[in-house]
Protein backbone atom coordinates (compact mmCIF):
# COMPACT_ATOMS: atom_id res chain seq x y z
CA UNK A 1 0.00 0.00 0.00
CA UNK A 2 2.86 2.39 0.84
CA UNK A 3 4.33 1.71 -2.60
CA UNK A 4 1.12 2.81 -4.31
CA UNK A 5 0.93 6.02 -2.29
CA UNK A 6 4.51 6.76 -3.29
CA UNK A 7 3.95 5.94 -6.97
CA UNK A 8 0.94 8.23 -7.30
CA UNK A 9 3.14 11.21 -6.34
CA UNK A 10 5.40 10.58 -9.39
CA UNK A 11 8.78 10.32 -7.58
CA UNK A 12 10.72 10.86 -10.81
CA UNK A 13 9.11 14.26 -11.32
CA UNK A 14 9.74 15.19 -7.67
CA UNK A 15 13.42 14.25 -7.99
CA UNK A 16 13.82 16.24 -11.20
CA UNK A 17 12.25 19.28 -9.59
CA UNK A 18 14.48 18.99 -6.53
CA UNK A 19 17.58 19.29 -8.72
CA UNK A 20 16.32 22.65 -9.98
CA UNK A 21 15.32 23.75 -6.46
CA UNK A 22 18.87 23.02 -5.29
CA UNK A 23 20.26 25.04 -8.19
CA UNK A 24 18.12 28.07 -7.41
CA UNK A 25 18.70 27.84 -3.66
CA UNK A 26 22.49 27.53 -3.86
CA UNK A 27 22.74 30.24 -6.51
CA UNK A 28 20.99 32.64 -4.13
CA UNK A 29 22.97 31.41 -1.10
CA UNK A 30 26.31 32.35 -2.70
CA UNK A 31 28.21 29.89 -0.54
CA UNK A 32 26.53 30.86 2.73
CA UNK A 33 24.14 27.93 3.11
CA UNK A 34 21.44 27.89 5.79
CA UNK A 35 21.06 24.11 6.06
CA UNK A 36 17.80 24.02 8.07
CA UNK A 37 16.26 26.39 5.50
CA UNK A 38 17.74 24.30 2.68
CA UNK A 39 16.21 21.06 3.93
CA UNK A 40 12.88 22.71 4.76
CA UNK A 41 12.68 24.22 1.28
CA UNK A 42 13.44 20.88 -0.37
CA UNK A 43 10.80 19.14 1.73
CA UNK A 44 8.23 21.90 1.24
CA UNK A 45 8.62 21.93 -2.54
CA UNK A 46 8.60 18.12 -2.64
CA UNK A 47 5.28 18.03 -0.81
CA UNK A 48 3.69 20.65 -3.08
CA UNK A 49 4.95 18.93 -6.24
CA UNK A 50 3.75 15.57 -4.92
CA UNK A 51 0.34 17.09 -4.23
CA UNK A 52 0.11 18.50 -7.74
CA UNK A 53 1.07 15.13 -9.22
CA UNK A 54 -1.60 13.29 -7.22
CA UNK A 55 -4.25 15.80 -8.29
CA UNK A 56 -3.04 15.42 -11.88
CA UNK A 57 -3.33 11.64 -11.63
CA UNK A 58 -6.87 12.03 -10.31
CA UNK A 59 -7.90 14.47 -13.05
CA UNK A 60 -6.31 12.42 -15.85
CA UNK A 61 -7.79 9.03 -14.92
CA UNK A 62 -9.96 8.94 -18.03
CA UNK A 63 -7.19 9.70 -20.51
CA UNK A 64 -4.46 7.80 -18.66
CA UNK A 65 -6.26 4.51 -19.31
CA UNK A 66 -6.06 5.21 -23.05
CA UNK A 67 -2.36 6.06 -23.21
CA UNK A 68 0.17 3.23 -23.32
CA UNK A 69 2.67 4.83 -20.94
CA UNK A 70 0.03 5.72 -18.30
CA UNK A 71 -2.45 2.84 -18.45
CA UNK A 72 -0.85 1.13 -15.44
CA UNK A 73 -0.94 4.11 -13.11
CA UNK A 74 -2.21 3.52 -9.60
CA UNK A 75 -5.54 5.34 -9.94
CA UNK A 76 -6.25 3.87 -13.37
CA UNK A 77 -5.87 0.36 -11.93
CA UNK A 78 -8.00 1.25 -8.90
CA UNK A 79 -5.26 0.55 -6.35
CA UNK A 80 -6.18 3.69 -4.41
CA UNK A 81 -9.71 5.01 -3.91
CA UNK A 82 -10.06 8.28 -5.90
CA UNK A 83 -11.68 10.06 -2.94
CA UNK A 84 -8.80 9.01 -0.70
CA UNK A 85 -6.33 10.32 -3.29
CA UNK A 86 -7.99 13.75 -3.12
CA UNK A 87 -7.59 13.85 0.66
CA UNK A 88 -3.99 12.64 0.32
CA UNK A 89 -3.20 15.31 -2.28
CA UNK A 90 -4.78 18.04 -0.16
CA UNK A 91 -2.82 17.07 2.95
CA UNK A 92 0.45 17.00 1.00
CA UNK A 93 -0.20 20.39 -0.56
CA UNK A 94 -1.26 22.14 2.63
CA UNK A 95 1.70 20.69 4.55
CA UNK A 96 4.16 21.79 1.87
CA UNK A 97 2.80 25.32 1.62
CA UNK A 98 2.70 25.77 5.39
CA UNK A 99 6.28 24.52 5.68
CA UNK A 100 7.47 27.00 3.06
CA UNK A 101 5.64 29.82 4.84
CA UNK A 102 6.97 28.96 8.30
CA UNK A 103 10.51 27.88 7.43
CA UNK A 104 11.19 30.16 4.45
CA UNK A 105 8.97 33.16 3.72
CA UNK A 106 5.59 34.19 2.37
CA UNK A 107 7.00 34.85 -1.11
CA UNK A 108 8.27 31.28 -1.44
CA UNK A 109 4.87 29.99 -0.36
CA UNK A 110 3.07 32.36 -2.72
CA UNK A 111 5.18 31.18 -5.66
CA UNK A 112 4.39 27.58 -4.73
CA UNK A 113 0.67 28.39 -4.64
CA UNK A 114 0.85 30.11 -8.04
CA UNK A 115 2.74 27.19 -9.58
CA UNK A 116 0.29 24.73 -8.06
CA UNK A 117 -2.79 26.61 -9.28
CA UNK A 118 -1.37 26.90 -12.80
CA UNK A 119 -0.48 23.19 -12.95
CA UNK A 120 -3.62 21.75 -11.37
CA UNK A 121 -6.28 24.38 -12.00
CA UNK A 122 -5.30 25.84 -15.36
CA UNK A 123 -3.20 23.18 -17.08
CA UNK A 124 -4.53 19.83 -15.83
CA UNK A 125 -8.21 20.77 -15.57
CA UNK A 126 -8.51 22.75 -18.79
CA UNK A 127 -5.60 23.72 -21.05
CA UNK A 128 -4.10 20.25 -21.44
CA UNK A 129 -7.33 18.96 -22.96
CA UNK A 130 -8.56 22.06 -24.76
CA UNK A 131 -5.67 24.05 -26.19
CA UNK A 132 -2.46 23.63 -28.14
CA UNK A 133 -1.06 26.25 -25.76
CA UNK A 134 -1.39 23.91 -22.79
CA UNK A 135 2.33 23.13 -22.92
CA UNK A 136 3.18 26.82 -22.74
CA UNK A 137 0.97 27.34 -19.69
CA UNK A 138 2.33 24.20 -18.05
CA UNK A 139 5.89 25.43 -18.55
CA UNK A 140 5.27 28.24 -16.06
CA UNK A 141 4.43 25.80 -13.28
CA UNK A 142 7.41 23.64 -14.24
CA UNK A 143 9.68 26.65 -13.81
CA UNK A 144 8.41 27.48 -10.32
CA UNK A 145 10.63 25.14 -8.20
CA UNK A 146 14.02 26.80 -8.90
CA UNK A 147 12.46 30.23 -8.38
CA UNK A 148 10.99 29.05 -5.07
CA UNK A 149 14.42 27.79 -4.03
CA UNK A 150 15.99 31.11 -4.97
CA UNK A 151 13.35 33.26 -3.26
CA UNK A 152 13.40 31.09 -0.12
CA UNK A 153 16.89 32.52 0.41
CA UNK A 154 16.46 36.08 -0.84
CA UNK A 155 12.89 36.80 0.23
CA UNK A 156 12.51 38.90 -2.92
CA UNK A 157 11.77 38.42 -6.60
CA UNK A 158 14.69 40.11 -8.31
CA UNK A 159 16.30 39.97 -11.74
CA UNK A 160 17.97 36.67 -10.86
CA UNK A 161 14.62 35.08 -10.06
CA UNK A 162 13.18 36.40 -13.33
CA UNK A 163 16.08 34.94 -15.32
CA UNK A 164 15.61 31.57 -13.63
CA UNK A 165 11.91 31.69 -14.52
CA UNK A 166 12.84 32.37 -18.15
CA UNK A 167 15.50 29.66 -18.33
CA UNK A 168 13.35 26.90 -16.91
CA UNK A 169 10.17 27.95 -18.74
CA UNK A 170 11.96 28.02 -22.08
CA UNK A 171 13.65 24.68 -21.34
CA UNK A 172 10.27 23.06 -20.69
CA UNK A 173 9.04 23.72 -24.22
CA UNK A 174 11.45 21.66 -26.37
CA UNK A 175 11.62 19.09 -23.56
CA UNK A 176 7.83 18.65 -23.62
CA UNK A 177 7.55 18.82 -27.41
CA UNK A 178 10.13 16.06 -27.72
CA UNK A 179 7.98 13.85 -25.47
CA UNK A 180 4.92 14.72 -27.56
CA UNK A 181 6.72 13.60 -30.72
CA UNK A 182 7.95 10.21 -29.51
CA UNK A 183 4.64 9.65 -27.69
CA UNK A 184 2.65 10.99 -30.66
CA UNK A 185 0.28 8.02 -30.93
CA UNK A 186 -0.55 8.16 -27.21
CA UNK A 187 -1.52 11.83 -27.36
CA UNK A 188 -3.42 11.33 -30.58
CA UNK A 189 -5.39 8.39 -29.16
CA UNK A 190 -6.28 10.38 -26.03
CA UNK A 191 -7.26 13.40 -28.14
CA UNK A 192 -4.82 15.70 -26.34
CA UNK A 193 -4.12 18.78 -28.50
CA UNK A 194 -0.33 18.94 -28.25
CA UNK A 195 1.49 20.80 -31.01
CA UNK A 196 2.69 17.74 -33.01
CA UNK A 197 -0.85 16.35 -33.14
CA UNK A 198 -2.51 19.65 -34.08
CA UNK A 199 0.12 21.34 -36.27
CA UNK A 200 2.33 18.44 -37.30
CA UNK A 201 5.86 17.33 -36.45
CA UNK A 202 7.54 19.65 -38.98
CA UNK A 203 6.01 22.73 -37.35
CA UNK A 204 6.95 21.36 -33.93
CA UNK A 205 10.59 21.06 -35.03
CA UNK A 206 10.56 24.77 -35.90
CA UNK A 207 9.18 25.61 -32.46
CA UNK A 208 11.77 23.40 -30.76
CA UNK A 209 14.60 25.18 -32.58
CA UNK A 210 13.29 28.64 -31.73
CA UNK A 211 12.75 27.79 -28.07
CA UNK A 212 16.26 26.36 -27.75
CA UNK A 213 17.67 29.57 -29.25
CA UNK A 214 15.69 31.61 -26.70
CA UNK A 215 16.82 29.22 -23.95
CA UNK A 216 20.43 29.79 -25.01
CA UNK A 217 20.08 33.55 -24.63
CA UNK A 218 18.34 33.21 -21.25
CA UNK A 219 21.06 30.92 -19.85
CA UNK A 220 23.78 33.40 -20.79
CA UNK A 221 21.88 36.22 -19.06
CA UNK A 222 22.61 34.66 -15.69
CA UNK A 223 26.31 35.43 -16.15
CA UNK A 224 25.88 38.66 -18.11
CA UNK A 225 23.68 40.01 -15.29
CA UNK A 226 26.31 39.13 -12.71
CA UNK A 227 24.62 36.21 -10.94
CA UNK A 228 26.76 33.30 -12.19
CA UNK A 229 30.43 32.99 -13.12
CA UNK A 230 32.27 32.19 -16.33
CA UNK A 231 32.57 28.46 -15.67
CA UNK A 232 28.78 28.36 -15.64
CA UNK A 233 28.79 30.45 -18.83
CA UNK A 234 31.05 27.97 -20.65
CA UNK A 235 28.89 25.01 -19.65
CA UNK A 236 25.67 26.88 -20.48
CA UNK A 237 26.98 27.83 -23.92
CA UNK A 238 28.27 24.32 -24.60
CA UNK A 239 25.06 22.47 -23.68
CA UNK A 240 22.91 25.03 -25.49
CA UNK A 241 24.92 24.77 -28.71
CA UNK A 242 24.93 20.97 -28.54
CA UNK A 243 21.18 20.88 -27.88
CA UNK A 244 20.59 23.27 -30.76
CA UNK A 245 22.70 21.06 -33.01
CA UNK A 246 20.59 18.07 -32.06
CA UNK A 247 17.44 20.04 -32.84
CA UNK A 248 18.75 21.04 -36.27
CA UNK A 249 19.65 17.43 -37.06
CA UNK A 250 15.97 16.69 -36.58
CA UNK A 251 15.22 18.27 -39.96
CA UNK A 252 17.13 15.41 -41.61
CA UNK A 253 16.01 12.68 -39.22
CA UNK A 254 14.71 9.51 -40.85
CA UNK A 255 13.02 8.42 -37.62
CA UNK A 256 11.40 11.29 -35.74
CA UNK A 257 10.61 9.17 -32.70
CA UNK A 258 14.24 8.11 -32.19
CA UNK A 259 15.47 11.65 -32.76
CA UNK A 260 12.92 13.13 -30.33
CA UNK A 261 13.82 10.63 -27.63
CA UNK A 262 17.50 11.57 -27.91
CA UNK A 263 16.56 15.25 -27.76
CA UNK A 264 14.49 14.56 -24.65
CA UNK A 265 17.31 12.68 -22.91
CA UNK A 266 19.78 15.47 -23.63
CA UNK A 267 17.33 18.07 -22.34
CA UNK A 268 17.57 16.41 -18.92
CA UNK A 269 21.37 16.37 -19.12
CA UNK A 270 21.35 20.04 -20.12
CA UNK A 271 19.17 21.34 -17.31
CA UNK A 272 20.91 19.16 -14.72
CA UNK A 273 24.28 20.53 -15.86
CA UNK A 274 23.06 24.10 -15.55
CA UNK A 275 21.55 23.46 -12.12
CA UNK A 276 24.85 22.01 -10.89
CA UNK A 277 26.94 24.82 -12.34
CA UNK A 278 24.78 27.62 -10.95
CA UNK A 279 25.06 25.89 -7.57
CA UNK A 280 28.86 26.08 -7.51
CA UNK A 281 29.77 29.00 -9.77
CA UNK A 282 27.90 32.00 -8.40
CA UNK A 283 28.74 35.68 -8.12
CA UNK A 284 28.02 38.05 -5.26
CA UNK A 285 25.70 40.55 -6.91
CA UNK A 286 23.72 43.59 -5.94
CA UNK A 287 20.32 42.49 -7.19
CA UNK A 288 17.62 44.57 -8.80
CA UNK A 289 14.53 43.91 -6.71
CA UNK A 290 11.26 43.40 -8.59
CA UNK A 291 9.07 42.12 -5.75
CA UNK A 292 9.76 41.74 -2.05
CA UNK A 293 7.95 40.72 1.09
CA UNK A 294 8.56 41.96 4.59
CA UNK A 295 6.63 40.48 7.42
Curated annotation (Swiss-Prot):
So which domain of life are we looking at?
Bacteria
The UniProt family comment states: Belongs to the UbiA prenyltransferase family. Protoheme IX farnesyltransferase subfamily.
Reactions it catalyzes: heme b + (2E,6E)-farnesyl diphosphate + H2O = Fe(II)-heme o + diphosphate
Report how it sits in the membrane.
Multi-pass membrane protein
Annotated pathway, please?
A: Porphyrin-containing compound metabolism; heme O biosynthesis; heme O from protoheme: step 1/1
Signal peptide start and end residues: none
Tell me a Gene Ontology molecular-function term this record carries: protoheme IX farnesyltransferase activity
Function, as annotated, reads: Converts heme B (protoheme IX) to heme O by substitution of the vinyl group on carbon 2 of heme B porphyrin ring with a hydroxyethyl farnesyl side group.
Record's Gene Ontology CC terms? plasma membrane
Any GO BP: heme O biosynthetic process
> What is the recorded name of this protein?
Protoheme IX farnesyltransferase
Parts of the chain that traverse the membrane: 8-28, 35-55, 74-94, 98-118, 132-152, 162-182, 208-228, 233-253, 264-284
Question: Encoded by which gene?
Answer: cyoE
Which of the seven top EC classes does this enzyme belong to?
transferase
User: Which InterPro entries does this entry report, sorted A to Z?
Assistant: Protohaem_IX_farnesylTrfase (IPR006369), UbiA_prenyltransferase (IPR000537), UbiA_prenylTrfase_CS (IPR030470), UbiA_sf (IPR044878)
Task: Give UniProt keywords alphabetically.
Answer: Cell inner membrane, Cell membrane, Heme biosynthesis, Membrane, Transferase, Transmembrane, Transmembrane helix
NCBIfam families found in the cross-reference section: cyoE_ctaB, PRK04375.1-1
EC assignment: the record states: 2.5.1.141
Query: Where is this gene product found?
Result: Cell inner membrane
Q: Any further remarks?
A: Carbon 2 of the heme B porphyrin ring is defined according to the Fischer nomenclature.
Principal place where this protein is found?
membrane
